[in-house]
């Protein structure tokens, strides 16, 4: 009589010595994914930081160039010249024509200009970018006083090309964007302090034990100009201030 075979199991048995996966592969994958995300985040933050550094440096360099251009414009304003060395020509207020304060040419002009600036009763004693010697703190760009601080000085400062006719560029010939920006509190300005000195300085001994005329000067009138130029960058945190002393030395006849 034939023997009946037992029914085969639908679920085969695992051979002895083998083990089922306990989820370690998934854990390893998650760890690598998290590490990849951290590396990507670090790379993006590094790139953003480098971009900020480069952007800040570019803005500072642009503001420095604008301040240097303002100093040169102030020198031309003092000499009454154009950038090519020719005499200043144009319509008011270019070349300080019209009812604006003018550069002194003779000694009497110095006295008249200083007397006119003395009549300013409120705020900085300045007119059209010409100022008396500042008293007190010299770094007005760091002051918050409404009457003598930066905001008050900006109101009496001179923009690039106002009295020299220098062009700030256009779309076809772009110039420094800071110089083109004339919005309130933006762009650049310069101020010229008129500092008279005694004519006896020309014959004074400038170096102890030196000759009386060790440095012969021929200045008419006897005035030194202290020029301060300030350029506000495209970012609020960028500001460049340059200052120089300028003496217009005249050739003897």
What is the predicted role of each segment?
Residues 2-6, 11, 16-253:
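Terminal alpha-helical segments
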